[in-house]
């Protein structure tokens, strides 16, 4: 029964949000266009319910600057002053309300991450896709980008198992407080969260590093 109620809340909430914030949306779009040009909206394929892909919308926060070899510069160098403000205030997320109206996302749920992460989850972590992704979620009010991927996914799965009207109301209320306080926006010393490599890739990297260290020690002995 709650999924039906949740969808009604999503439609009403996203619709009201777009109406209330329409002057902000228009104003920010103009500012981004003046500073960075087109496109104003950043569109990227993300996995949704049961891993099905959809295009997620956000306000653009970075330039497309590249080095002499045509390779994109690091995120920290491409993130503009306006982009930093949009991220710290979470205003870059406002266009996701269109995704909520379309039914790709919910107001509350695990955040939609990158498509390549689907192959890197453990079976337990993959359970985060048993519900629609959200504009905000349980992990976002419990550390956001200052906690590890493993902690974040554990919180996502906990939400899947405990989703309810009152929990969603609590998350929305706490999100408003966190946004006002600007907590947990990014990991220390980084413009964006480090890429999730997955448990098995991490284990392989550790083994590879151990092999290299062992080989180096053998060379020293020889």
Q: Which positions does each model-derived feature cover?
A:
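A short, structured surface patch at a secondary-structure boundary
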Residues: 75-132, 172-175
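Cytosol-/stroma-facing membrane-proximal "stalk/adaptor" domains immediately downstream
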Residues: 128, 138-187
């Amino acid at each position: 029964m709650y999924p039906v109620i949740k969808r009604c809340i999503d439609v009403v909430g996203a619709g009201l949000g777009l109406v209330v914030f329409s002057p902000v949306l228009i104003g920010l779009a103009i500012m981004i266009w003046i500073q960075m040009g087109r496109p104003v909206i950043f569109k990227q394929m993300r996995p949704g319910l049961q891993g099905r892909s959809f295009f997620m919308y956000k306000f653009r926060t970075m330039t497309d600057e590249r080095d002499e070899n045509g390779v994109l510069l690091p995120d920290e160098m491409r993130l503009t002053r306006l982009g930093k403000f949009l991220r710290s205030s979470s205003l870059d997320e406002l266009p996701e309300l269109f995704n909520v109206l379309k039914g790709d996302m919910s107001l509350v749920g695990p955040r939609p991450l990158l498509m390549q992460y689907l192959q890197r989850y453990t079976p337990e972590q993959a359970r985060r896709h048993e519900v629609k992704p959200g504009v905000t979620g349980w992990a976002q009010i419990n550390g956001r980008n200052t906690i590890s991927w493993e902690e974040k996914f554990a919180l996502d799965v906990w939400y899947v198992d405990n989703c309810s009207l009152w929990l969603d109301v609590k998350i929305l209320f706490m999100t408003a407080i966190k946004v006002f306080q600007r907590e947990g926006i990014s990991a220390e010393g980084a413009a964006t969260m480090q890429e999730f490599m997955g448990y098995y890739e991490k284990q392989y990297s550790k083994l590879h590093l151990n092999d290299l260290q062992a080989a180096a020690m053998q060379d020293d002995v020889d």
